[in-house]
Amino acid sequence: MIYGIIVSHRNVGHGILNALVGMYGDVDCLVSLSNEGLSTNELADNIREAARFAGEEGVCVFVDAYGGSCWRASKLARLRNAHVITGFNLPMLLSFVTKRATIPFGELPAVLETDGKRGIRIE
């Protein structure tokens, strides 16, 4: 099973995961990690620990901001068979939950990027 880890500043990831559960129901394929009170190395350790549940199919690490401590920790974790996807939003995560079982792991990031961008509108 393809697994997802949300890595964010403070409670951003927890909040978006809670919203996703409210929309979709139980989401056992995603976990949220916060950087609050952690060094970059400690957060990288937590990411590695969370990735153990991913198995061989792969893990998508969703990071809130490029270049920040969460992104650095995600890169420092050096996960095998992983995609680090920066700039997540609710439509992207909903797409992950609903499509991860039907789209090959190598193609999934492009689909998620498209769906995430599709969820952004200026009116």
Predicted ranges, named:
Residues M1-E123:
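N-terminal loops that bind phosphate or other acidic moieties
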